[in-house]
């Protein structure tokens, strides 16, 4: 008997998942996509399998705006294990070296300021960055080490939350592209004892925070009770990740032309920058950019 093809639902919105430990970001995405029976899905930047916490998942039309969440600042809490370095910079790697930890709380507090602000980081070998088309982590697994260029990142917060040797818990707020594993390794090197990430929890991704995140267990329970449609209650609007942008409401006439790809004028628009655009009813219809001549050019549109 032929297998009946599952008809997926055309739904749109953002679901903020509290990713469980031990699952890749893509595995988490595919699991939630299956629960929602969603036609189109994408995530907004990978979390290591070891990490837990905020992972915004985009469905349907919301996937058009996932890039802007990829570029957003992130927040983390990490447990730094001093005295042990590993091949991967976290607890999943093999131990490279072990040293005695004689670091005190004051030593750690005094080391933190040099890592705040704009700093240079060399990306780890165990990362998804590519060298000549090959992901670095694949080269690392083959025993290769290649030269990586340092990258500029910004650490806006780096605070000590608790100190229980050989572990310390840190709060980190940082720009996109920051590797907390590298931050912890570099900090361990400055302290003279080495260190790795024993645990990592993302507390924020752009405007989304941990309090908004739904656990996989909750999604599975609600799905078991009410099916895919019961999970729609957890979907946020497509522009939820862009609420820090100015909003512009167009007249019915202007919205018609704008949705057909034509730049329009709006007296109340700002003089420059990106905008969330609504039609005359207040419905989000896409994002636009103010051009040099003051018109609002459509950049990404919502399919009605």
Swiss-Prot record:
Per its UniProt record, what CDD domains does this chain match?
A: PseudoU_synth_EcTruB, PUA_TruB_bacterial
Which cysteines does the record link by disulfide bonds?
A: none
Tell me the GO BP annotations in alphabetical order: mRNA pseudouridine synthesis; tRNA pseudouridine synthesis
Record keywords: Isomerase, tRNA processing
Q: Offer one Pfam family short name for this entry.
A: TruB-C_2
Q: Which molecular-function annotation in GO is an example for this chain?
A: RNA binding
Q: Which residues form the active site?
A: 48 (nucleophile)
Instruction: Give the E.C. number(s).
Output: 5.4.99.25
The record's family statement is: Belongs to the pseudouridine synthase TruB family. Type 1 subfamily.
Q: Which InterPro entries match?
A: PsdUridine_synth_cat_dom_sf, PsdUridine_synth_N, PUA-like_sf, PUA_sf, tRNA_psdUridine_synth_TruB, tRNA_sdUridine_synth_fam1_C, TruB_C
Which reaction does this enzyme catalyse, per its entry?
Answer: uridine(55) in tRNA = pseudouridine(55) in tRNA
Q: What does this protein do?
A: Responsible for synthesis of pseudouridine from uracil-55 in the psi GC loop of transfer RNAs.
Query: What protein name is recorded for this chain?
Result: tRNA pseudouridine synthase B
């Amino acid at each position: 008997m032929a297998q009946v093809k599952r008809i997926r639902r055309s739904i749109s919105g953002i679901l903020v998942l509290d990713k469980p430990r031990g699952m890749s970001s893509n595995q988490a995405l595919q699991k939630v996509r299956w629960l929602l029976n969603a036609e189109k899905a994408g995530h907004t930047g990978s979390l290591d399998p070891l990490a837990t916490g905020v992972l915004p998942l985009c469905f349907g039309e919301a996937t058009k705006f996932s890039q802007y969440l990829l570029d957003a600042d992130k927040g983390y809490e990490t447990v730094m294990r001093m005295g042990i370095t590993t091949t991967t910079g976290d607890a999943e790697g093999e131990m490279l070296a072990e040293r005695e930890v004689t670091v005190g709380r004051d030593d750690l507090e005094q080391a933190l300021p040099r890592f705040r602000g704009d700093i240079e980081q060399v990306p780890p070998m165990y990362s998804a960055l590519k060298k000549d088309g090959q992901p670095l982590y694949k080269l690392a697994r083959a025993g290769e080490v290649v030269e990586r260029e340092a990258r500029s990142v910004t650490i806006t917060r780096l605070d000590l939350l608790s100190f229980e040797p050989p572990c310390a818990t840190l709060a980190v707020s940082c720009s996109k592209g920051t590797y907390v594993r590298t931050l912890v390794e570099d900090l361990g090197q400055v302290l003279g004892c080495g260190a790795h990430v024993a645990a990592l929890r993302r507390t924020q991704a752009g405007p989304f925070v941990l309090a908004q995140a739904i656990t996989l267990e909750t999604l599975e329970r609600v799905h078991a009770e009410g099916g895919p449609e019961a999970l729609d209650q957890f979907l946020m609007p497509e522009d939820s990740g862009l609420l820090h942008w100015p909003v512009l409401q167009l007249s019915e006439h202007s919205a018609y032309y704008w949705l057909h790809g034509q730049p329009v004028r709006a007296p109340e628009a700002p003089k420059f920058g990106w905008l969330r655009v609504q039609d005359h009813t207040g419905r989000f219809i896409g994002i636009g950019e103010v051009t040099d001549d003051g018109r609002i050019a459509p950049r990404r549109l919502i399919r009605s």
